[in-house]
């Protein structure tokens, strides 16, 4: 959590994270071949840092006493959304910029495009897709004209299962391996 607080203090500065990689064969350290670095945690730290710098989240919103660690199954923004059902659904035709940024599947560019496009006409889910919104994540947290995406029949408990199923191909590829500076490759 210190890393998150540190990156929040210097909004414009870039923070770099690195999983521990033993490089010595000293007997008091884990053997390099037996130790798998927590690369997924490193990835989640970068995602959280991005939320702090560009999406106006605060560190205590991402990690708290009830959720002291990142969910390894979904990204920090999806995890926040699942832990705050009272915030959703967000009505895309009335929500302000800050509310749009908290919806999984809506990024900074898409949120700005939504604000511009809805001045001309009410937005639909088809229109959101054209604006670059990732509906496979956003559909669970948005309404257009007070209605959910047609055909969406998912209970709140089922949302996590659906989001995990979408990320499963990435997680099922096996644990990523850190490239070595010392070994020659092919």
Map each language-model feature to its residues.
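Residue-level signature of tetratricopeptide-repeat
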Residues: 117-118
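Conserved, mostly hydrophobic/aromatic
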Residues: 48, 114
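Single conserved hydrophobic/aromatic residue that forms the stacking wall/gate
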Residues: 1-6, 10-11
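Anionic-ligand-binding alpha/beta catalytic cores of soluble enzymes and soluble regulatory domains
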Residues: 37, 41-47
């Amino acid at each position: 959590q210190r890393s998150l607080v540190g990156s929040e203090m210097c909004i414009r500065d870039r923070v770099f994270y690195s999983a521990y990689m033993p490089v010595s064969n000293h007997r008091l350290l884990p053997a390099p071949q037996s130790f798998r670095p927590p690369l997924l945690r490193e990835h989640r730290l970068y995602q959280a840092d991005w939320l702090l710098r560009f999406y106006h989240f605060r560190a205590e919103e991402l990690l708290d006493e009830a959720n002291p660690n990142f969910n390894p199954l979904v990204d920090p923004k999806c995890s926040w959304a699942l832990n705050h059902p009272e915030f959703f659904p967000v009505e895309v035709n009335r929500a302000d910029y800050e509310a749009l940024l908290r919806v999984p599947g809506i990024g900074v560019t898409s949120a700005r495009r939504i604000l511009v496009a809805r001045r001309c006409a009410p937005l639909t889910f088809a229109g959101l897709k054209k604006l670059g919104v990732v509906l496979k994540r956003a559909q669970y947290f948005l309404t257009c004209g007070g209605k959910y995406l047609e055909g969406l029949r998912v209970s709140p408990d089922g949302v996590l299962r659906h989001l995990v199923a979408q990320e499963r191909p990435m997680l099922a590829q096996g644990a990523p391996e850190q490239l070595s500076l010392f070994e020659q490759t092919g």
